[in-house]
């Protein structure tokens, strides 16, 4: 038995979930090959259940781990809906990393990214990374209500004239006034994926997850657009406190289906007529805390089960005048998506650019085959795209669609920037 954490479930009441791990170097984001990962139940951390190794791309195979029945995440109960595991990661030339509290849900693929610190040559004290409980299971402070539309500042202007998707979010890991809390620079999409994985269950319907991701996106982009905390004298974008913003946990396990939804809609936010700024869409769990005129997370789950679309769920809580908008500017991206997919038979400059970017990425991720930069989308380009999609947890289609275009751009910018610094 892998699932040994004492939950209110019998041994006959056990499902399975999945885990895949990707290890990168903390100082340059280069994949860490041949890292060894020991997996243990949190209740018995010194009794490894599995041992797996990363490949040349820093990625492990997907493994099956025991998880509580899926029903535990379908309605509020006294049964913890996820199992928890500890990871110990070791690799030549790097300090050991320990992560405690990796959460596995029934039927879902957990993606655990691990940032490994190069060995400094001197012995260090272990400081395990502890992943806190999910917001729908643990008790966190309820959101302090705010106006959903922020007033202009005293100078009569808001710093940004248009809604921009930032390259990074600066997350203050505590309350705004906690000067001991650390600030983290987090890529925008990774931040949204982390928050969604903290706030809702990946076992919920696609429609419900999409509605909640839209609310998280809009809330976050309101903080970016209004420069809410910077206007108060702070040097960060948002906090990890549920009393002020949403939950974000350093090194949190994210889930593949949530990741793919975020990649598909990360430029969207929620608007009202004649209001430029993204709406500060606040929400609560809807069970322990109720919040009239805000979205109920559990309520949105039940609406999704009934077949409501994401915008129908949104309007059920925020009103019929709410609509989905899209940011025109994405920071840090070489070129915007052309508006159409690239696939077998496509030709031209956009194809050449993708080929060039894939070849650069392949220098860091060697399983991606290099291709001839000729502007013709043939079988070799399709194969390179498919391998890229496998590595970065996108649907493997061999087609450069909207999510794949921006993921290639993001990774290309990352590896190119790192090369400039070396």
What are these regions (language model features)?
Residues 1-32, 44, 52:
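Beta-strand-rich domain onsets/edges
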Residues 2-3, 12, 34, 38, ...:
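Conserved, single-site charged/polar hotspot
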Residues 18-20, 34-36, 84-86:
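Exposed beta-strand and adjacent loop surfaces of beta-rich binding modules
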Residues 27, 41-45, 93-95:
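Solvent-exposed strand-loop boundary residues in beta-sheet-rich modules
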Residues 43, 49, 70-73:
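Contiguous segments within soluble domain cores/interaction surfaces
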Residues 55-79:
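Short, surface-exposed beta-strand/beta-hairpin micro-motifs centered on an aromatic residue
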Residues 70-100:
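A short, solvent-exposed loop/turn motif at the edges and junctions
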